[in-house]
Regions:
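Hydrophobic side chains in well-ordered alpha-helices
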Residues: 10, 59, 121-124, 287-293, ...
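N-terminal glycine-rich flavin-associated loop
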Residues: 14, 38-70, 88, 92-136, ...
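Conserved A3 ("GATE") glycine/threonine-rich loop of ANL adenylate-forming enzymes
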Residues: 77-78, 138-148, 253
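C-terminal substrate-binding/cap subdomain adjacent to the FAD-binding core in PCMH-type
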Residues: 147-149, 156-160, 167-368
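N-terminal flexible segment immediately upstream of the FAD-binding catalytic core
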Residues: 1-65, 75-108, 137, 160, ...
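Glycine-rich, histidine-containing beta strand-loop boundary motifs that form or position
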Residues: 27, 72-76, 83, 114, ...
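Extended, hydrophobic alpha-helical segments in both membrane/secreted and soluble proteins
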Residues: 70-72, 79-80, 121, 277, ...
Length: 368
């Protein structure tokens, strides 16, 4: 394949429907878009700042027609080079910031486009007493598209409230340009008619995985802990409906399966009180045993809305001697001869009475 010829033909085609001020091919701007938050760098040949899913659908079809690889990018806060490419980069940031609050009985869902920043979602939800469950460290700049596509979670939401568990439905653009909204019965029915074999293959794969008891058990076990390596296999054992499998497979796919143009997510209640503690231990073993003991007090994930009332320790992060020494914490320096490990523990959220009880119970466990 003659790449330069394909690129020229591709550019000629997309310039018919994408304004030239949103297409970058010059050396300076392509260089600028050639890196993310990782240490990788690849200079894209073409950068397109997209504006709407119909436009993305046409761009994707053009890429496929001219056999050009393409990569999607939101904020570019990824640490592993997911949004770097040396071919076509399709950016979904500006112009992708719409949202809609959806009441679902006593709970709230929120419909989000991929270009809205995670922290902005929490600003929107705060007056409603709700919170966006995923909380990656980069939430102040990471956008919803990247958070969901990477199944980013952060320290506090663990696996019980990550993007996969909180996703309700997704609106996606497939590599053939087809737009599918898994939350719309009309869209699902149209997809059944246009892609029957696609759905049949997903159902056959689902049945094949479930028929292998050892594989099924291994998948269930793997996704009880943080596991974002490779494509998301949990939907094959967690959902029967092929459309649910499609939607949840997008989570963690890093843009390799489809373009995520909209996602509907559950929200959780935002409680007013939280507590944190820095705990020190004589050995890594003691710290590990404390984590196990605290985990035994954590609520299950069956009903997230109710479990928040019973949650004792929400998260615990271990620090070894080297990391403690690097901080030069005054308390640690005072006891550095005896201390070998530390735990940062977060309790709550909850009301004041509930949180006081949590603190007392946690102190009892860690002293034992």
């Amino acid at each position: 394949m003659n790449y330069e010829l394909s690129k020229r033909q591709f550019l000629a085609e997309i310039k018919r429907f994408v304004p030239k001020d949103r297409i970058y091919t010059d050396e300076l701007r392509t260089l600028g878009w050639g890196t993310d938050a990782s240490f990788y760098r690849q200079t894209p040949q073409v950068v397109i700042r997209s504006d709407g899913e119909e436009e993305v659908s046409r761009i994707v079809r053009a890429c496929r027609k001219h056999r050009l690889p393409f990569t999607f990018r939101a904020a570019g806060t990824s640490l592993s080079g997911q949004s770097c490419t040396d071919s076509v980069l399709i950016v979904a940031g500006k112009h992708w910031e719409r949202y809609e609050i959806i009441e679902q009985g006593e709970s709230l869902h929120i419909k989000l486009q991929p270009g809205i920043v995670g922290a902005r979602v929490n600003e929107i939800l705060k007056p409603l007493g709700r919170v966006f469950p995923p909380d990656p460290a980069s939430i102040g700049s990471a956008m919803v598209g990247g958070i969901v596509n990477n199944n980013a979670s952060g320290m506090n939401c663990g696996v019980h409230a990550n993007s996969d568990r909180m996703l309700v439905s997704a609106r996606i653009v497939l590599t053939d340009g087809t737009i599918l909204d898994t939350g719309s019965e009309a869209s699902r029915e149209a997809f059944r008619r246009s892609h029957p074999e696609f759905l049949s293959r997903i159902e056959r794969l689902r049945d094949k995985v479930r028929a292998d008891e050892e594989l099924r058990a291994r998948i269930i076990k793997k996704y009880r802990i943080k596991n974002v390596t490779g494509l998301n296999l949990r939907p094959l054992v967690a959902y029967d409906d092929p459309f649910d499998i499609i939607a949840h497979s997008i989570v963690g796919s890093e843009g390799t399966l489809a373009f995520l143009s909209e996602v509907t997510m559950k929200t959780l209640r935002d409680y007013p009180y939280r507590a944190s503690a820095m705990l020190y231990f004589l050995s890594m073993r003691e710290a590990s045993e404390a984590v196990v003991a605290m985990k035994g007090l954590m609520a299950g994930e069956e009903d997230l809305e109710m479990s928040a009332e019973r949650l004792v320790v929400k998260s615990a992060e271990m620090l070894d001697y080297k990391s403690l020494s690097a901080v030069d914490d005054p308390v640690f320096l005072q006891y550095r001869q005896d201390v070998d490990a530390g735990l940062i523990a977060n309790a709550g959220p909850g009301d004041y009475r509930h949180l006081t009880a949590i603190i007392t119970e946690t102190k009892t466990i860690t002293h034992e």
